[in-house]
UniProtKB/Swiss-Prot annotation:
The record marks N10 as: Discriminates between blocked and unblocked aminoacyl-tRNA. GO terms for biological process: protein quality control for misfolded or incompletely synthesized proteins; rescue of stalled ribosome. Its EC number is 3.1.1.29. This is Peptidyl-tRNA hydrolase. It comes from Porphyromonas gingivalis (strain ATCC BAA-308 / W83). The keyword Signal does not apply. The keyword Secreted does not apply. TRNA binds at Y15, Y64, N66, N112. Belongs to the PTH family.
């Protein structure tokens, strides 16, 4: 089976290491775990790897976050991957920092990347792995928070959290979403 694993983030060096780019961080950790490198391709950087009998297409869209749907649709069509075999890795302000939550579908929760993917797909029925950022920001400072860098304390915890995310992603591809949610959520 073939899966499309999409890490959401903003392109450009100024966004490296920001909270909003934690989707890129998770997909980078997966590529590193698989010993594969990303190459520039249409609509983003792509890497290919295998996990047992599953073929994974890893995607970091090079569109801005709010246009991620174009990249997702293109690679779904290019690789003939059904929506049930797409997993989007995304940041989430509604979850406490470091919480990882796998969902089979759902609203965009105010996330412009998820909103655009749903608009382009015409459906909210696609899986997402949400990485909790927490809500430790003053009213009206949400944008500054997500575009800001992790604190040193948070940064120290990220390697273990991304390792855990890699386990969840692999389980999604090998055991399916329901068994993976039962085990990890």
């Amino acid at each position: 089976m073939k899966y499309l694993i999409v890490g959401l983030g903003n392109i450009g060096g100024e966004y490296n290491g920001t909270r909003h780019n934690v989707g890129f961080r998770m997909v980078n950790a997966l590529a590193e775990d698989g010993g594969v490198q990303f190459v520039e391709a249409r609509y983003g950087a792509i890497a290919r790897m295998r996990v047992k009998n599953a073929e994974l297409i890893l995607l970091k869209p090079n569109t801005y976050m709010n246009l991620s749907g174009n990249a997702v649709r293109y690679w779904m069509q290019q690789e003939n991957i059904p929506r049930e075999q797409v997993l989007v890795l995304v940041d989430d302000l509604a979850l406490p920092f470091g919480t990882l939550r796998l969902k089979p579908k759902g609203s965009d929760a105010g996330h412009n990347g998820l909103k655009n993917i749903a608009e382009v797909m015409g459906s909210i029925d696609y899986a997402r792995l949400r990485f909790g950022l927490g809500d430790e920001f003053s009213k009206g400072r949400q944008v500054d928070f997500v575009l800001g860098r992790f604190t040193p304390e948070e940064e120290e915890k990220l390697p273990e959290l991304t390792k855990h995310a890699v386990e969840i992603i692999k389980s999604f591809c090998l055991a399916g979403i329901q068994r993976t949610m039962n085990r990890y959520n």
